[in-house]
Amino acid sequence: MNTLKNKGRWIKPVLKYFGILFVLLCAPAFANECVSYKITPKITISAPTWTKEVVQPLEPMNMWHGNVVATMVDNYDIVADITSVEDGFCVGIKQVDAEIGYSNFLVQVDIRHVPNTCSYDAVLAHEDQHIREYLSVIDDFQVELHNALYSAADSVMPIFVYNSSDIDLAIEEINNKIQSHPEMVIIKQKIKADEEIRNKRIDKNDNSETLKKCFL
């Protein structure tokens, strides 16, 4: 009796082991089957409609310079190519609609500058230069952004899922792979670096002469 019980105890773990092994061995096979369903992804990139808000913090700032807080967004809408195959679905990329750029500029001006006065307008004019540079950086990198996004999207192979309920998770995984792709990481770093260079150039070339004239 003890021997039979022991055998019974071993049967379930062994069956469970073979079940797991079957899934592990078959999943790559199904994934390989999905490769044949890969298509060339279409890429579109648009810039968000941006807004500007001017505020005057209660605490004193540098009277000669304002400050711009730029909010950058990069959203990726994946249009999936879903193919029904034996035992599941292949989820690939048909199109990526990206929105990349600045959505908001928060301009801070020292509270000692009264709105609609010479000094207030002079500070705003300077900060508007920074805003124009932020926008021009995105414009100048459009080709590189498109190429980087295409390379990232084209590198992602279709993902196999067993159930239709897992398709959304597959699309989320595709999105993460695109955003973490080396070319996407590098292009964002290049944009940030160029922003810093251009903003420093504006401040370096500004001797505040326009603002100083307001106090003569």
Which positions does each model-derived feature cover?
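Metalloprotease/metallohydrolase-associated module, dominated by Zn2+-dependent proteases
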Residues: 35, 51-98, 153-216
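Bacterial N-terminal signal peptides that target proteins for export
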Residues: 4-18
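Short N-terminal segments immediately surrounding and downstream of signal-peptide cleavage
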Residues: 32-47
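Catalytic Zn2+-binding segment of zinc metalloproteases
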Residues: 128-143
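Short alpha-helix carrying the canonical HExxH Zn2+-binding catalytic motif
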Residues: 117-129
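Bacterial N-terminal signal peptides
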Residues: 17-26
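Active-site scaffold of zinc-dependent metalloenzymes
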Residues: 87-119
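Sec/Tat signal peptide C-region and signal peptidase I cleavage site
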Residues: 27-31
